[in-house]
Amino acid sequence: VFFLKSYRKPRELTWLSGILLLFLMLGFGFSGYLLPWDELAYFATKVGTGIAGAVPIVGHFTLRLLRGGDDVTGATLSRFYGLHVAILPAVTTALVALHLLFVQQQGMSVPLSIERKLKPGERLPQMRFFPNYILRDVLAWYVVLAVLAALAAFYPWELGTKADPFA
């Protein structure tokens, strides 16, 4: 992004939608971490929501909103589950569609050196979205999925002891 200057005109909205997708992925990671409901997840969520609670003025409200009360309880688990499996996927789907629409309309960002070589009024040579970009993305997704499946099969993450804050 920095080297290609992807955030410059006319692609500001494409860049902003990509940044929002990044924050949504961080939200998936944060909300999904609690779902095993083991001790590590319990205390990590307690610390993570406590950090949100430390924000001046809106912190206490945010803390209570995230936790569903003053403490991390079953209500917090229900909130994070609903957020993780319903709200975040719906928002992500809509934002990915919007991001792809922006990419289709405005094209991909190219290095400044290539843009400088263009004559006034000349357009960049375009590569078709389908099948070129789609096939590259599908191939990359399958490679990442294969690596993730191999890691899960060969190095499974064991669930810890069940979260019991009163023990």
Model-derived features: where do they sit?
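Membrane-embedded and interfacial regions of multi-pass energy-transducing membrane proteins
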Residues: 2-167
